[in-house]
Regions:
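Bacterial N-terminal signal peptides that target proteins for export
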Residues: 1-8
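Residue-identity detector for glycine
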Residues: 3, 16-18
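Basic polycationic patches enriched in arginine
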Residues: 6, 21-23
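Bacterial N-terminal signal peptides
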Residues: 8-16
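Hydrophobic small-molecule pocket/channel-lining residues, especially in calycin-type beta-barrels
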Residues: 23-178
Length: 178
């Protein structure tokens, strides 16, 4: 092999090593952590300011909701607040994703205090909906966020177990962008 042929071969080998090394580093990157940013095309539709009208145990309620990515884009923070003064209800919800377990994880902190905020919610996406399950001390609770692309609204349905173990609506809301 001539000297110029060796030089060309060496350059080709070096050029191929860069992309191969980058692919190896990507394969070795952890599934979760600060370098694995949470990207979710469905939840991206939830960012911004919303009016949130609905019913809780049959009673009409109106809230405001502000949603934005926080904590290095690892969580979508939802800030809910009753429009009444003083507010009858407030919540801060942190919705993220656990890549290792392949599920959503949710921290729901609200005006009801620590007892009900100690439970994490876990969920899955099905089409345009994310269904979360919370195993509270007094029983399981479902919260489903559903994106309605036609009218660009969200619906939120919350369900708990009633007498006899039958699932019943706890609350339902429709969100409209402000």
């Amino acid at each position: 092999m001539t000297g110029s042929a060796r030089l060309v071969l060496a350059l080709l080998l070096c050029a191929g090593a860069g992309p191969a090394r980058a692919r190896a580093q990507e394969a070795d990157a952890p599934l979760d952590g600060p370098r694995r940013i949470f990207q979710d095309s469905l939840l991206e539709h939830l960012t911004g300011d919303w009016s949130m009208a609905g019913r809780v145990r049959g009673r009409p309620v109106t809230y405001t909701l502000h949603a934005e990515w926080v904590l290095n884009h690892q969580f979508l923070e939802l800030r809910m607040r009753d429009v009444a003064e003083p507010p009858a209800y407030q919540a801060m919800v942190y919705l993220g994703y656990d890549n290792t377990s392949e599920r959503y994880v949710t921290h729901w902190l609200d005006a009801f205090g620590g007892r009900w905020s100690e439970t994490l919610g876990y969920g899955q996406r099905a089409g345009a909906a994310v269904r979360l399950v919370f195993e509270y001390p007094d029983g399981p609770f479902h919260t489903t966020f559903t994106w309605n692309p036609k009218d660009r609204t969200w619906t939120v349905l919350m369900e708990d177990r009633g007498p006899g173990g039958v699932w019943q609506e706890f609350a339902s809301y429709t969100l409209h962008h402000k």
